[in-house]
Amino acid sequence: MSIEIPAGLTELLQGFTVEVLRHQPADLLEFALQHFTRLQQENERKGAARFGHEGRTWGDAGAAAGGGTPSKGVNFAEEPMRSDSENGEEEEAAEAGAFNAPVINRFTRRASVCAEAYNPDEEEDDAESRIIHPKTDDQRNRLQEACKDILLFKNLDPEQMSQVLDAMFEKLVKEGEHVIDQGDDGDNFYVIDRGTFDIYVKCDGVGRCVGNYDNRGSFGELALMYNTPRAATITATSPGALWGLDRVTFRRIIVKNNAKKRKMYESFIESLPFLKSLEVSERLKVVDVIGTKVYNDGEQIIAQGDSADSFFIVESGEVRITMKRKGKSDIEENGAVEIARCLRGQYFGELALVTNKPRAASAHAIGTVKCLAMDVQAFERLLGPCMEIMKRNIATYEEQLVALFGTNMDIVEPTA
């Protein structure tokens, strides 16, 4: 069955996506409602303008013939210009209590959003040297605090985040100094450490202030993600300090490391016996919904008897699998016996997802452990077609339980 994409849908969604990336709204649904409502209102105004123009022509003719009053159309030329500011992670000012919807420049066609081709595999790790700008402990702590809520960095693992912090350099600015200028090529992404800044957008050659930053926020990442000129001028209105990240380092850390991580996840998925029947496209979907979790030494990952909500693949570290036997005591204080250990690339927790039964065993971290996790909803949505194949492995697990405990039902029942 072929599905025809309605005309204009792609451009509509692309425009909305860019606005979300620029403004990073806390309430995405409210932002979407305001965004599309505004678009609808603008279309209605344009229709009214066309109707008004036709009405004015008819009215002028009527006035010439019979002295009638000319009808009035909509005069957009008298309306103030509204425009976007370049705002990747704009934070609300301390006194602001509500989210303000972004404004759109209705007179300028949206510029193309594109980027030069970039292949992370073309760079060799051996040829790269890690960029480090020395920082004091206080500077590093302030920088880490400033970066913790930036969307671009939320999915970075601790090692990648450490690389970002090392590579960021401090830029001191004076009052009145231009940090970036509208139309210039984007070279750096900036995080505000301290200071106030105004956002200016040129309209008919005249710059107009459309917003400001007050000791927090970030800007410039759109120019690093896409090959597009700066959309605004940022001017310091007080002495301040910024942390900058250059284009090359940004692309290497964010893009290349994510590409390497994705390949690693794909290799993990390919190695799982119960997923071997999946097509390549299906495996890629699995990779898209996988999340990562880090556990400290001795921390419980899953508990025997709990309801199953996800299964895990060990990315790094070692996991200890234990099981309690009903009515029997063991040498361990908690009455559990160790039945297995999982290392890098091995998985656990999938049996409960197949059988819809409570967890049959517990898992604890040995040292620091990083796991890939897929929740049960995504599991059922994506892996439904291969459930029967997965169930073929149940016999193997039941044989292991029988060998260990004499029966495959000899586990502690979950307590209410």
UniProtKB/Swiss-Prot annotation:
PTM field: Phosphorylated by the activated catalytic chain.
Binding residue positions for 3',5'-cyclic AMP 2: 274-416
PROSITE patterns, sorted: CNMP_BINDING_1, CNMP_BINDING_2, CNMP_BINDING_3
Tissue: Four types of regulatory chains are found: I-alpha, I-beta, II-alpha, and II-beta. Their expression varies among tissues and is in some cases constitutive and in others inducible. Brain. Present in a few pyramidal neurons and mostly in mossy fibers. Colocalizes with PJA2 in dentate granule cells and at postsynaptic sites of primary hippocampal neurons.
Any GO BP: negative regulation of cAMP/PKA signal transduction
Localisation: Cytoplasm; Cell membrane
Name of the protein this chain belongs to: cAMP-dependent protein kinase type II-beta regulatory subunit
Organism this protein belongs to: Rattus norvegicus (Rat)
